[in-house]
């Protein structure tokens, strides 16, 4: 891989044009909740272990499972209270494991982009064909469960490859 992938030109902060937001707003923010699913005993990957402790890591799994059982619902209620729409970074396994979560996002017209199938299955070491199949499967799963056609991809656990740097 090249030391600089040349995805964008260098532009120092002081040389950038001034950004103006609609209605004269001084601040803009984007709320992109990661709605993820971690397997208790994921398949191995020689490049990275999914858990910091031996498998099954019940402690780490339960911390992460809290998000779908309690954290998501609390976050959604707070966002709704303040009129904030989400852009969901989604492990698409949530569509099968917790369809109620997906239904609530759809009901609120949140936008989805794929964050892989499971957050414990990495793209490191995949061939281009394997990675393409993973992405196509994720996009098809989200469209089936939400009706949305995806335009974005964020590799699971940020395990980008040379093909998915941006």
Question: Can you name each region flagged by the protein language model?
Answer:
Residues 1-152, 157-166:
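Catalytic alpha-helical scaffold of carbohydrate-active enzymes acting on polysaccharides/glycoconjugates
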């Amino acid at each position: 891989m090249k030391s600089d992938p040349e995805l964008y030109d260098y532009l120092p902060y002081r040389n950038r044009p001034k950004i103006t937001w609609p209605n004269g707003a001084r601040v803009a923010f984007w709320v992109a909740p990661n709605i993820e699913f971690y397997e208790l005993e994921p398949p191995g990957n020689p490049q990275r272990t999914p858990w910091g402790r031996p498998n099954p890591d019940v402690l780490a799994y339960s911390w992460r499972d809290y998000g779908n059982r309690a954290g998501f619902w609390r976050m959604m209620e707070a966002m709704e209270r303040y009129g904030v729409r989400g852009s969901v970074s989604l492990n698409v396994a949530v569509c099968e494991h917790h369809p109620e979560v997906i239904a609530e996002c759809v009901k609120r017209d949140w936008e989805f982009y794929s964050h892989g199938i499971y957050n414990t299955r990495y793209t490191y070491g995949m061939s281009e064909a394997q990675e393409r199949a993973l992405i196509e499967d994720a996009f098809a799963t989200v469209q089936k469960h939400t009706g949305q056609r995806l335009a974005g991809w964020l590799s699971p656990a940020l395990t980008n490859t040379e093909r998915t740097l941006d």
